């Protein structure tokens, strides 16, 4: 399982650990990932995703998973989230017509 957020594509970064004597050694900064179950109101089902805490705040700020996915760039989404976005768009289009 990769250490990458399924909604925002945040992944590990590389940097330095700096000691008191200013000696630098390589280290990895890992994203704060959580396994969460989010509810899709359009589809009427819950979806289990591995997302960063930053993405959780963004989902809440945008008004839910459906609104976040509709605004999100499909290139940043995981295949699972991209498929979910397509399903939501298809369902909204069918409801509109």
Curated annotation (Swiss-Prot):
Disulfide bonds: none annotated. SUPFAM superfamilies: L28p-like. One of its GO terms (cellular component) is cytosolic large ribosomal subunit. GO terms for biological process: translation. Transmembrane segments: none annotated. Pfam families: Ribosomal_L28. It comes from the Bacteria. Keywords: Ribonucleoprotein, Ribosomal protein. Belongs to the bacterial ribosomal protein bL28 family. This is Large ribosomal subunit protein bL28. The gene is rpmB.
């Amino acid at each position: 399982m990769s250490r990458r957020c399924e909604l925002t594509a945040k992944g590990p970064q590389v940097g330095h650990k700096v000691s008191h004597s200013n000696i630098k050694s390589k280290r990895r900064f890992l994203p704060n990932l959580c396994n969460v179950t989010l509810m899709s109101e359009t589809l009427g089902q819950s979806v289990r995703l591995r997302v960063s805490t930053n993405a959780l705040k963004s989902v809440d700020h945008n008004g839910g998973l459906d609104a976040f996915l509709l605004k999100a760039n499909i290139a940043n989404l995981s295949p699972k989230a991209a498929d979910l976005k397509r399903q939501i768009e298809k369902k909204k289009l069918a409801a509109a017509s």
